[in-house]
């Protein structure tokens, strides 16, 4: 059966790991790759699989909403400007502590986290120990020092 993760092209090892994680996800995932490598698409497909009652069928309401960028329990956050601002970090922490709107979990996709700097430690505790209903998918071009702790887990 085809599923949403079949849409991720050229990353069979990453897809296999994400597919294996759908039934029992952990608190955070770090997807690293250069621009154009497909990390954002993989994160979206993974979010759909996590919220889908069938593990990512691609056809149900949850899958369609996630893939269309309209699911209330999936939030994609991209820092504005050259670096992650304190306000951005605060918003991420606030969103992480809110309950899901529709389902049992919510997914926060944190894009361009290679741009995190001084406020990285502020986010670290939230990313490492979110509420049980929150799954983080962290996207980065590289793994800067501030993300090493996340990468090591």
Where are these regions (language model features)?
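P-loop/Walker A NTP-binding region and its immediately flanking N-terminal helices
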Residues: 1-118, 135, 148
């Amino acid at each position: 059966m085809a599923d949403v993760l079949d849409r991720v092209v050229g990353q069979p090892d990453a897809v296999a790991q994400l597919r294996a994680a759908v039934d029992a996800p952990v608190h955070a995932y770090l997807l690293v790759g250069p621009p154009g490598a497909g990390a954002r698409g993989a994160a979206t497909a993974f979010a759909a699989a996590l919220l889908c009652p069938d593990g990512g069928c691609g056809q149900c309401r949850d899958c369609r909403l996630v893939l269309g960028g309209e699911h209330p329990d999936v939030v994609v956050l991209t820092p504005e400007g050259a670096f992650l601002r304190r306000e951005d970090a605060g918003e991420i922490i606030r969103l992480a502590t809110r309950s899901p709107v529709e389902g049992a979990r919510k997914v926060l996709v944190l894009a361009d986290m290679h741009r995190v700097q001084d406020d990285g430690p502020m986010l670290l505790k939230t990313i490492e120990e979110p509420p049980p209903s929150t799954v983080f998918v962290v996207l980065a071009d590289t793994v800067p020092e501030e993300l090493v702790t996340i990468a090591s887990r």
